[in-house]
Amino acid sequence: MRTLIAVLGFAALLDAADAPPPVVYMDAAKVAEALAKTGLITTNSEFMVAGAHREKPGQVELHEKTTDILFVVEGEALYVTGGKMIDGKQTRPGEWIGTNIEGGVEHHLKKGDVIVVPANTPHWFKEVTLCNSFMVRVNKP
């Protein structure tokens, strides 16, 4: 839990600007619910915090103006970052999906791990049987 607090604190430091957004509190039951089915915890124009539940691989993603921070709380996954996105298609401004990554780095994520994926970095849950994580997205202006 201390690691999660550190991750959220890091996200807040990245976001230090004018007036702070309101404090958001969610009790343990709602956090568990968010983790069980991929649910939003809080969001505003500067950041988003969600519980992410995965039982299968995903698509390659790239966010031009968003840094993703993941804190794994259960399970494991093979997560690929960097390299070149293959068959990239823009889904909306600044957001891309693809089918594969060429030349990326593989990370074996497990409980307790944190990974920070800077904006403009392809990333991909390549192999997953179960991986629950907190995801913090920090938006660049």
How does the language model describe each region?
Residues 3-13:
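Sec-dependent N-terminal signal peptides
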Residues 13-65:
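A short, N-terminal "cap"/entry segment at the start of jelly-roll beta-barrel domains
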Residues 56, 93, 123:
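Short histidine
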Residues 70:
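Structured binding elements
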Residues 76-79:
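Short beta-strand segments in beta-sandwich/barrel cores
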Residues 84, 89-119:
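Short acidic-glycine-tyrosine-enriched beta hairpin
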Residues 108-113, 119-141:
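Ligand-binding loop in jelly-roll beta-barrel domains
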